[in-house]
From Swiss-Prot:
EC code(s) of this entry: 6.3.4.3
Protein name: Formate--tetrahydrofolate ligase
Enzyme class of the recorded protein, top EC level: ligase
Pathway: One-carbon metabolism; tetrahydrofolate interconversion
Gene name per UniProt: fhs
Pfam families, alphabetized: FTHFS
């Protein structure tokens, strides 16, 4: 089979204004970024139209390190729906350069189910990530200047909560000391870098409803505390307007197309293990305004991305999906069934069966939100017919719809079985009204307990001294009503990345609590999860090259 980049280059792309016209977006409203990429103004969102259309969430069982193919399936489902005569749009997150050059590679789908132009999308795209990085680090620079200028006055700060960000995987930047070299170079400070998708600015961009809401949220970002223990925000620096200016264009959703010219909104990019893991509210709402069926995805397994999608994004935006699709693969089931990672591509019926416990827990979790659930099997070349039949049989026993998909190899044609099941389920057995895991008025500890016990299956939770201190600060600030965003490993229900399957009777340790006052959420850090990833021994960057002006090795 041809490589992703070869397939992408052979696709006959339509000019982006033509793609917009197929949706009903006026040509004069489209802001071109070249021939095949555009931004669309937020004022086109129509809440009345949204309510008449169908939102579908694509999530997954606990993934392997190579991923599970959610983005490919999301794109392929949109292609399949269009194949059977439905007006479908897909709404996805933007890829990050860190994983693109790190372990996973790009995030524009794969095979014959991609969003295009994939080279642009996987690399610099419309500059949204650069805008987030610039805005975040501009705050840091202005904050450092304030600290320097007030270092010998009563207006100084004693506790700083704001780091820097870069869109790279670089473990050496996690903990640094800035301001070295004498008094002319600033005040020495222990600090560090997070990756851009973990930036509070990224979360704000994805949750803001318009430019005024964006500015309000930016102004409320908590940067630290004064010598009198008072919170110090971006508004106190007097720079909310300046930072919003840097984000003005990044706020607008990006319109692109798939390998079969299906419209796609690709906007925002928080990770689900260290942030809330969903594309922007504005992109999802734009897609719902113009598409009868809108497919979106949430990062990693359903315990992370989907939980935050429902408890944070849907609650904030008033969204309620008609259906949730859980993606499973033979390789991931075997990994969670006790098969060594290096052997998961080999046939192993017993290991596959043992992995059903992981699938069942995710199904149970999605049903706890009132969701109607179907399972789709993302086929790989190494899968056997017997393995596929066993998964289908298991889903039937559980009373859950099942559909094969082979969209990677066949595009929309390989997604028609799934598309028909999706339409039939929505028409005859749609999801119930959304039920949340916790109430916003619950104390933070209660929220953590409910997610940890109901979604992860934890038996107990302990807090470090630092986390206890942060919880007291939250109470004093009067923001205990914020939703929580748990940061933990994506490879297990527990905080141990090697506890495959369904962990039992385990303790979760809350290491830190981060106040995202602008994003209006509380980030709860569990285990050893890092907000700045590192690179593997063999990074994807070693496969990427440019020959005669053409990019090679990007996938």
């Amino acid at each position: 089979m041809k490589s992703d980049i070869e397939i992408a280059r052979e696709t006959d792309l339509r000019k982006i204004k033509e793609v917009a016209t197929t949706l009903g977006i006026p040509r004069e409203e489209v802001q071109n970024y070249g021939r095949y990429i555009a931004k669309v103004p937020i004022h086109l969102i129509d809440k009345k139209q949204m309510d008449q259309h169908n939102l579908i969430l694509v999530t997954a069982i606990t993934p392997t390190k190579a991923g599970i193919g959610k983005t490919t399936v999301s794109i392929g489902l949109a292609l399949g729906l269009n194949k059977i005569g439905k007006k479908a749009v897909v709404a996805l997150r933007e890829p990050s350069l860190g994983p693109c050059f790190g372990m996973k590679g790009g995030a524009a789908g794969g095979g014959y189910a991609q969003v295009l132009p994939m080279e642009n999308i996987n690399l610099h795209f419309t500059g949204d990530f650069h805008a987030v990085t610039s805005a975040h680090n501009m705050i840091t620079a202005l904050l450092d200047n304030y600290i320097y200028q007030t270092r010998n006055t009563c207006e100084g700060l004693k506790e700083i909560k704001w780091k820097r960000v870069l869109d790279v995987n670089d473990r050496s930047l996690r903990n640094i000391v800035s301001g070295l070299g004498g008094s002319a170079n600033g005040v020495p400070t222990e600090t560090g870098f997070d990756i851009t998708p973990a930036s509070e600015i990224m979360a704000i961009l994805c949750l803001a409803t318009d430019i005024e809401d964006l500015k309000r949220r930016v102004g409320n970002i908590l940067l630290g505390y004064t010598n009198e223990d008072k919170p110090f925000t971006v508004n106190d620096l007097g720079i909310a307007g300046a930072i919003t200016v840097l984000l003005k264009d990044a706020l607008l959703p990006n319109l692109v197309q798939t390998t079969e010219n299906t419209p796609a909104f690709v906007h925002g990019g928080p990770f689900a293990n260290i942030a809330h893991g969903c594309n922007s509210i504005s992109a999802t709402q734009m897609a719902l305004t113009y598409g009868d069926y809108v497919i979106t995805e949430a990062g990693f397994g359903a315990d992370l991305g989907a939980e935050k999608f429902f408890n944070i994004k849907c609650r904030k935006a008033g969204l309620s999906p008609k259906l949730t699709v859980i993606v499973a693969t033979a390789q991931s089931l075997k990994l969670h069934g006790g098969v060594p990672e290096k052997e998961i591509k080999e046939p192993n019926i017993e290991g596959l069966k043992n992995g059903f416990a992981n699938l069942d827990k995710h199904i149970e979790n999605m049903k706890s939100f009132g969701q109607q659930v179907i399972v789709t099997f993302n086929r790989f070349a190494t899968d056997t017919d017997e393995e596929i039949a066993l998964v289908a049989e298991h889903c039937e026993e559980k009373g859950v719809g099942f559909a094969m998909n082979n969209v990677f190899a066949e595009g929309g044609e390989g997604g028609t079985e799934l598309a028909r099941l999706v339409v039939d389920t929505i028409e005859n057995h749609p999801s119930a009204p959304l039920q949340y895991t916790y109430d916003l008025n619950d104390p933070i500890r209660t929220k953590v307990q409910k997610v940890a016990q109901k979604i992860y299956g934890a038996s107990s939770i302990v807090y470090t001294t630092l986390a206890d201190k942060k919880l007291r600060q939250i109470e004093s600030l009067g923001i205990s009503h914020y939703p929580i965003c748990i940061a933990k490993t994506q490879y297990s229900f527990s905080s141990d990345p090697k506890a495959y399957g369904v962990a039992k009777d385990f303790e979760l340790k809350v290491r830190d609590v981060i106040i995202n006052n602008g994003a209006e959420m509380i980030v709860v850090v569990m285990g050893e999860i890092m907000r700045m990833p590192g690179l593997p021994k063999e990074p994807q960057a070693r496969k990427i090259d440019i020959v005669d002006g053409m990019i090679e090795g990007l996938s």
